[in-house]
Amino acid sequence: MAKTLYEKLFDAHVVYEAENETPLLYIDRHLVHEVTSPQAFDGLRAHGRPVRQPGKTFATMDHNVSTQTKDINACGEMARIQMQELIKNCKEFGVELYDLNHPYQGIVHVMGPEQGVTLPGMTIVCGDSHTATHGAFGALAFGIGTSEVEHVLATQTLKQGRAKTMKIEVQGKAAPGITAKDIVLAIIGKTGSAGGTGHVVEFCGEAIRDLSMEGRMTLCNMAIEMGAKAGLVAPDETTFNYVKGRLHAPKGKDFDDAVAYWKTLQTDEGATFDTVVTLQAEEMSPQVTWGTNPGQVISVNDNIPDPASFADPVERASAEKALAYMGLKPGIPLTEVAIDKVFIGSCTNSRIEDLRAAAEIAKGRKVAPGVQALVVPGSGPVKAQAEAEGLDKIFIEAGFEWRLPGCSMCLAMNNDRLNPGERCASTSNRNFEGRQGRGGRTHLVSPAMAAAAAVTGHFADIRNIK
């Protein structure tokens, strides 16, 4: 029987499946951070259980860390306790930890792929909703809760029901300046923020194949923002070339054997999906969210929509509430909306290609008066690479702040946050009320669009910036 990629990955990992019971899946990789793991380790300790497979478990610090100092005390008592607990737990249970002073420390979903921890064909879990990022490699990756974190630590397995399947095909080639972030925001604009609920999404089509691995990670990172369980891109030569030579990747003949298997990780011809969505890449333009969920998104050259234009009463009410929170009026051009802060970073857009795209816009320009702009590399290696290329100097000269790696202003769990009423052009993945700080107003954009907003002081079409 013809199978989808998701079905192949799922079936290959079923350990046990009794009739009328949820299947038990084997987990190949477990990524751990300081926020969702303390109670899980406490649970192990209380029952006298070890971590079953320490060699398949990797930990880092990212959510709570300061991006201005390596001092563990910098972000307050709760953050300090969580980080100290992670150090203690990893030492006690034999788990590899990339702590604040480790050169590989960074956002968990940047670190995993970078170190070759993430490989095609794997099941990967983490106590973090954006674990879907790793699906870019043709891995089945999804976020789990703290009780599930404990279960995986103890057993290296997890009970998981089968999801429905969705195919999102982006046909044709994207125009210059249109990034993976624009593509995924356009997709969510079409499906809505709940359009993928109950599904695992496979992204395909020429525009997806054309993306680098970093672009594919951006894409899969935001699968969760359309309500999907996970996002997938089938592995190909782009994938294999990215993985080759990385720290934890197979070497020599083992790598060749792995590639031979990875090449089978494609949806079979004739396999059926529960839902199919098709978009045309050439119709896409730079995207900016205007509301309080990622599905409330328009082209940078559009006007703020009028809630009255929505036929669905629920959508209309949601739009009215969003505009009130965002302090926006219907009908005004998006390019006239001024911003206070810019955040370039997060597990969506903090990799080297993202920083290069932002630096290209920043070069030779200055951050607009009254705007604070942060650039936060996703990991130690990304920061080192950017500095080797001189990107830090470009940003600093333009008036951006060049920070240490961490989750930073994506979420209000550290010192980087918005004040009430402040408006931010952000490369992160969520624009919910209060996500970047109580009363903060978040607009999601690509790195180049964020840099353009920083230097102009408002939203601007990067295609017009010469």
From Swiss-Prot:
Cofactor binding comment, as recorded: Binds 1 [4Fe-4S] cluster per subunit.
Keywords on record: 4Fe-4S, Amino-acid biosynthesis, Branched-chain amino acid biosynthesis, Iron, Iron-sulfur, Leucine biosynthesis, Lyase, Metal-binding
GO molecular function, one term: 4 iron, 4 sulfur cluster binding
Binding site for [4Fe-4S] cluster: 347, 407, 410
Catalytic activity: (2R,3S)-3-isopropylmalate = (2S)-2-isopropylmalate
Record-listed E.C. numbers: 4.2.1.33
Top-tier EC class: lyase
GO biological process terms, semicolon-separated: L-leucine biosynthetic process
Cofactor needs: [4Fe-4S] cluster
Pathway membership, UniProt: Amino-acid biosynthesis; L-leucine biosynthesis; L-leucine from 3-methyl-2-oxobutanoate: step 2/4
Sequence similarity: Belongs to the aconitase/IPM isomerase family. LeuC type 1 subfamily.
Protein role: Catalyzes the isomerization between 2-isopropylmalate and 3-isopropylmalate, via the formation of 2-isopropylmaleate.
HAMAP family: LeuC_type1 (MF_01026)
Assembly information from the UniProt record: Heterodimer of LeuC and LeuD.
Protein name: 3-isopropylmalate dehydratase large subunit
Organism: Escherichia coli O127:H6 (strain E2348/69 / EPEC)
